[in-house]
Design a protein with these regions (language model features):
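Transmembrane alpha-helical segments of polytopic membrane transport and secretion proteins
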Residues: 1-32, 293-305
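Amphipathic cytosolic juxtamembrane alpha-helices at the membrane-cytosol interface
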Residues: 22, 101, 114-119, 187-188, ...
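Transmembrane alpha-helix signature in integral membrane proteins
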Residues: 80-108
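Cytoplasmic-entry segments and transmembrane alpha-helices of multi-pass inner-membrane transporters
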Residues: 101-140, 304-305
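Generic hydrophobic transmembrane alpha-helix motif, especially the helices
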Residues: 126-171
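Interhelical loop and adjacent transmembrane-helix boundary motif
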Residues: 150, 235-283
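Transmembrane alpha-helices
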Residues: 178-179, 183, 201-237
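C-terminal transmembrane helix and the adjacent membrane-cytosol boundary/short C-terminal tail
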Residues: 180-184, 188, 195, 262-305
Length: 305
């Protein structure tokens, strides 16, 4: 009884309107957090429930490491290794192009560009981020694909290379915008101290500012990778959409996302279940990328401390 009385004394109801408003806002923040977590949990449960049955029927090894996809054949095959490798190679290639270009652009905008140039470039990047995926795909199909075919003497330019270039352009706004914000947040004392010790502007930017902003820059890279690996429409218009192994940059390929988009409208039975399994694999990939990058960043922060 005494313990209950003490607990009741500790729980004090808000008295003033400001305290009531604070209590209501705290409850709303808590509710929004629970809602966000609940959405992730529901999506995860739905993906697992929809994707696991096909994997059980097909077999995990045959599904993940099979090299042939023929879902509408008389004897259907459900091997998604070509899709996995195409997505990995495409995302990796786009990252290798987009990250250096995006980071250098962010450093330029944050540290070197004049006000007028910064305004023009930032406006262009904001416009680029607002362009729909289908427009990127249309431009790639009409301009990039024929250019690749002519430049390399190929019958068709719809291939892995075209997809990589389009994805690299599409991830630039995410990387640049977040990186600029992170670089602008670096305390000016860091740079002033470096310059006072005799370092050049370039040395200060890349040895002081960029390492100090690495968490924010990494967040931009994660957003870019997420956009690249999850893109479907633009890739479907420039990659060729043939379920081939990506053994060449000029090979017509199918990504995990485009396999789903291409067949889901008419799929049924085991074929539809297999497409949900592909979505589950894609979901796991994105989660693993986020976890690995978070672990690496936290490890780097602990080492610095």
């Amino acid at each position: 009884m005494k313990q209950n009385a003490l607990l009741l004394k500790k729980i004090e109801l808000p008295r003033t309107p400001a305290e009531w408003l604070e209590a209501v806002m705290n409850f709303l923040f808590f509710l929004c957090g629970i809602l966000a977590v609940g959405c992730v949990v529901l999506i995860s449960v739905y993906m697992i429930a929809s994707g696991v049955p096909a994997i059980r029927k097909i077999g995990l090894f045959r599904f993940l490491f099979g090299t042939e996809w023929a879902s509408t054949a008389a004897d259907p095959k459900y091997g998604i290794l070509p899709f996995i490798l195409s997505s990995v190679y495409g995302t990796l290639g786009a990252t290798l192009i987009g990250v250096p270009v995006g980071l250098l652009t962010a450093v330029f905008l944050s540290k070197a560009a004049g006000p007028r140039v910064r305004t023009v470039v930032v406006t262009a990047i904001e416009l680029l981020s607002g362009i729909p995926s289908v427009v990127f795909g249309l431009l790639g199909m009409q301009v990039l694909v024929p250019a690749v075919a002519r430049a390399f003497g190929k019958a068709s330019g719809a291939c892995l290379l075209s997809a990589i270039v389009v994805l690299a352009i599409m991830i630039l706004p995410s990387i640049v915008s977040v990186s600029v914000t992170a670089l602008n947040a670096v305390p000016p004392e860091y740079e002033q101290g470096s310059l006072a010790l005799g370092a050049t502007d370039t040395e200060t930017w890349f040895k002081i500012s960029v390492p100090a902003a690495k968490s924010g820059i990494a967040a931009g890279i994660v957003l870019g990778i997420g956009r690249a690996i999850g893109e479907a429409m633009a890739v479907m218009m420039v990659a060729g959409n043939s379920p081939n192994m990506p053994d060449s940059l000029f090979r017509s390929v199918t990504f995990l996302t485009t396999a789903i988009a291409k067949e889901m409208s008419y799929a049924s039975g085991l074929q539809k279940q297999a497409l949900f399994s592909i979505a589950l694999v894609l979901f796991v990939f994105i989660m693993l990328i986020n976890v690995v990058l978070n672990v690496v960043l936290k490890g780097g922060d602990r080492d610095e401390r």
